[in-house]
């Protein structure tokens, strides 16, 4: 026994619009998910950099004081690394802000594509219900009229 689904011709255009709306919405949802993942990754990296930088600052200052406030090559390179980590943390913060703006735009786009998807789904169901009702009325209208004529 084969399972074949018969799709009436009157539903095919509406189903094509539904498939297109679904694909558009899924693409926007995927982009939003990618953006949310990037935001969380950037926040994690920023937190790691800030944590490393905080402990390195204390270590660097302790070494600087212990060395009699003399800047050695090792202390200079340590300072450069600290500054680089601080700037990287700031870049992660800036990236998070940019991605948050992008996320907000994608939310609006997702809302729009979701609405179009729901409307396309409603159109398919409405068209199917309309055709089925018309067919049912046409199938029963003749016998109903005959019964009314016979009764009168």
Can you annotate each of these PLM segments?
Residues 1-32:
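Short, charge-rich amphipathic alpha-helices with coiled-coil/heptad character
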Residues 19-22, 53, 75, 148:
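Generic low-complexity, intrinsically disordered sequence content enriched
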Residues 27-91, 95-124:
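Extended alpha-helical coiled-coil "stalk/arm" regions
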Residues 97, 104, 108, 127-152:
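A long, low-hydrophobicity, low-complexity, charged/polar interaction segment common
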């Amino acid at each position: 026994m084969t399972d074949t689904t018969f799709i009436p011709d009157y539903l095919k255009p509406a189903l094509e619009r539904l498939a297109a709306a679904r694909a558009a919405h899924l693409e926007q949802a995927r982009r939003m998910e990618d953006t949310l993942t990037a935001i969380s990754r950037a926040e994690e990296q920023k937190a790691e950099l800030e944590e490393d930088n905080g402990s390195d600052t204390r270590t660097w200052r302790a070494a600087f004081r212990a060395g009699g406030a003399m800047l050695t090559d090792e202390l200079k390179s340590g300072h450069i690394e600290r500054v680089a980590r601080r700037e990287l943390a700031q870049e992660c913060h800036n990236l998070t802000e940019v991605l948050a703006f992008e996320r907000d735009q994608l939310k609006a786009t997702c809302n729009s594509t979701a609405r179009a998807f729901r409307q396309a789904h409603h159109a398919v169901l409405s068209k199917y219900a309309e055709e089925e009702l018309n067919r049912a009325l046409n199938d029963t209208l003749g016998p109903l009229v005959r019964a009314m004529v016979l009764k009168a």
